[in-house]
Design a protein with these regions (language model features):
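Iron-associated oxidoreductase/ferritin-like identity signal
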Residues: 1-84
């Protein structure tokens, strides 16, 4: 389970790297390719998250609790926090 968590962290780091490079270029094709790669890494995160759910049943419970806490705090749309 720890190795899967580490792999998830690595995928998030890769996403950040590809998106940072994509944001830094004005070359439309390069930007599109880099964003596509970042999106593939996001799919990997989803695969790893599903694997964690299978290996650690408490994972889903913890995620559900976290979502509920955000909902209760009135922060249903987290992205609004970062756009203001």
């Amino acid at each position: 389970v720890r190795a899967i968590r580490d792999a998830t962290i690595a995928e998030h780091a890769a996403i950040k790297q590809y998106e940072t490079v994509a944001d830094s270029t004005n070359h439309a094709k390069a930007k599109a390719v880099l964003q596509d790669i970042a999106n593939e890494e996001k799919a990997h995160v989803g695969e790893l998250q599903k694997l964690l759910s299978l290996l650690d049943p408490q994972e889903d419970e913890s995620l559900a609790e976290g979502k509920e806490e955000v909902k209760e705090a009135g922060l249903i749309c987290i992205s609004k926090l970062f756009l203001n």
